[in-house]
Each structure stands twice: as structure tokens, then as C-alpha cells.
């Protein structure tokens, strides 16, 4: 087993917020393992990429087991997520199962895979990527249920694992200018302008904003921060309804 002491596992690290997190951790000197369905467009030199559909339990367990045998992983970022938007009348059991499989179940599997190494080291950092949708968002019933579930997972694991030197926190991004967001919300569109006007700092967030928060929570010096949800939202979640 390779025990560099700074090995981080991240899910969904090939694009968007996940890619920014990978690049930040590499810049900070981590060995980074990226689990994703698709490879990154420009793999980094010190990045290990494993192609896996995290909704596939058998395949993902096999990959995680092999990685845990090779690496002493002491940092985990559960970033992979899927969305199936729609009104509550159209939410199906299949939708719920599909979103839970990636957003919640795969996060639990990843924690289970890295815990032996973290407990052996008496040190670990786990960050779950949530969303402001956990506080409620129209047409996101299934998605918001899973992200709120990550909050419960975060708080429960913080209580269970704190005595082992393992911290568990969540980061909840607000509106972030990723490629997918820009495709759905053109920068000059009136709806996009309304979103920006609703953000106290009057700008969209960037993937790097989220990566900075994640890097802080993964830092050695963050050992007294656990069980918390940090919203990276430009203040949007502070004043929900303040203009009503």
C-alpha cells in the first residue's frame, strides 16, 4: 500500500466543480484519484483516473476495494451527483432510486471504502458536496431530498468518527458558472440577470470558489471543524425570502 499521507479520492472529478477541486488539490500537493463515468479532457500528471458508473454498485465496490488496497486514502470528496428536475406530480420511484444511487448510496460506499485507512491513521477528512437545493428549490423534489440526506449523513458521521480523528463536513454551492449552467442560463438572458441580482455579492460563483472551500476543510488545520454545512453561495442562502 502506498502511504504518501496526502492521497485524496474525489468522485465526479472530470468536469465542472469536480474538476476545479481536482486541480486545486493537485496544486496543493495531493495525490488525487478521480472516479467518474467520463475521463477529463486534459488529465493531470499526478492524477489517477478510474472510469466507473457510481450507480453500478458491484462495479464501484470492486474499484473502491482495489483502490483501498493500493492507496492509503485519508481525504474523500463525494462530489458526483445527478439531477432529475420536474414537478412533484411527475416524480417517479425510478427517478428517486436513480438519484439516490449516485447522490447518497455511492457516497456511503466511498466512506466505507476509505474508513479502514483513515482509522488506522487516526486521521481523515471527508467533504460531501451538497447544494443550496437542500434548503428547498422548485422542481427539484428528488434532488433536494438527496442533498438534504447528505446533510444528515454529514452530521451523523461527524458524531461517529470524530474520536478517530476524522472530520466530516459538507459544502453547499450556490449558483456556480459551470459549462452546464451557462448552457442552460446564457449570460445575457434576463433570467440569468435576475439570478445574479438575487446574490448579495452580485456575481456568479466559480468552480474555484467551491474548490477553495473544499481545500480548507481538507486541510490539516481544520481538525476542529466537523459536522458543518458551508454554503458557498455569495450570501444567497443567508437572506432567503428577505425581499418578500
Model-flagged regions — what are they?
Residues 79-84, 235:
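Conserved NAD(P)H cofactor-binding loop of Rossmann-fold oxidoreductase domains
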Residues 87-88, 95-100, 191, 195:
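Substrate-binding pocket helix/loop in short-chain dehydrogenase/reductase
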Residues 91, 132, 137-145, 156, ...:
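Active-site loop-to-helix junction immediately N-terminal to the catalytic Tyr of the SDR YXXXK motif
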Residues 111, 146, 154:
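Active-site helix of classical SDR
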Residues 116, 159-163, 223:
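Alpha-helical segment proximal to the catalytic Tyr-Lys
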Residues 172-183, 232:
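Short, flexible catalytic-loop segment of classical short-chain dehydrogenase/reductase
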Residues 226-244:
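Short C-terminal tail/terminal secondary-structure segment
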